[in-house]
Regions:
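Alpha-helix capping/helix-boundary segments
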Residues: 11, 46, 81, 97, ...
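Acidic active-site catalytic centers that drive phospho-/nucleotidyl reactions
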Residues: 8, 94, 113
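Short, well-structured N-terminal submotif of metal-dependent ribonuclease cores
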Residues: 1-40, 56-60, 127, 134-140
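PIN-domain endoribonuclease scaffold, especially VapC-family toxins
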Residues: 27-88, 95, 99, 122
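Acidic, PIN/NYN-like endoribonuclease modules and their adjacent C-terminal/linker elements
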Residues: 2, 103-140
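Short, surface-exposed amphipathic charged segments that create phosphate/polyanion-binding patches used
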Residues: 89-91, 140
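A short acidic, helix-capping loop that chelates divalent metal ions and anchors anionic groups
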Residues: 14-16, 49, 119
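Short, hydrophobic/aromatic-rich beta-strand segments within well-structured domains
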Residues: 11, 50, 100, 107-111
Length: 140
């Protein structure tokens, strides 16, 4: 069974605009998703926030997300997520996304800003793209 990963907004934006931060690892993650080696999820808010952040680049973000959603699942929020300890996060959106991923039994939460994730649960690791690639694809 493939590892289930949740992609934070910054990872999706980095991939779309080819931002240099850990770009090789980010591209390897998306290649693995496309080749069905990883089962990836985002949320509706990741899509809407990314579209908002990418408006300055004058690219067809709707077409990009239509394509991405052919191989990336969209996890829906439900009220159970709202009752999780989101207030432990300094960034409410990060808390919502993290607990959405946890509620949907993800194995890994991939983000560029690990510092915002001071409260985590043992069943859901928070990793940068490089850390994830080293953890999953490095020989043991």
């Amino acid at each position: 069974m493939a590892n289930k990963i949740f992609l934070d907004t910054n990872i999706v934006v980095d991939f779309i605009i080819k931002r240099e931060f850990e770009l090789a690892a980010t591209e390897q993650i998306f290649d693995s998703i496309h080749n069905n080696k990883l089962e990836a999820y985002i949320s509706e808010s990741v899509i809407s926030t990314s579209i908002y952040l990418l408006r300055q680049y004058k690219i067809d973000t709707l077409a990009i997300f239509r394509d991405l959603c052919k191989f990336i699942h969209v996890a829906a929020f439900n009220r159970n997520v709202l009752f999780m300890p989101i207030e432990k996060f300094s960034d409410t959106e990060d808390g919502l996304l993290y607990f959405l991923a946890n509620h949907n039994k993800m194995n890994y939460f991939i983000t560029r800003n690990k510092k915002d994730f001071v409260y985590t649960v043992p069943s859901l690791s928070v990793l940068t793209p490089d850390e994830f690639i080293k953890t999953i694809f490095s020989p043991r």
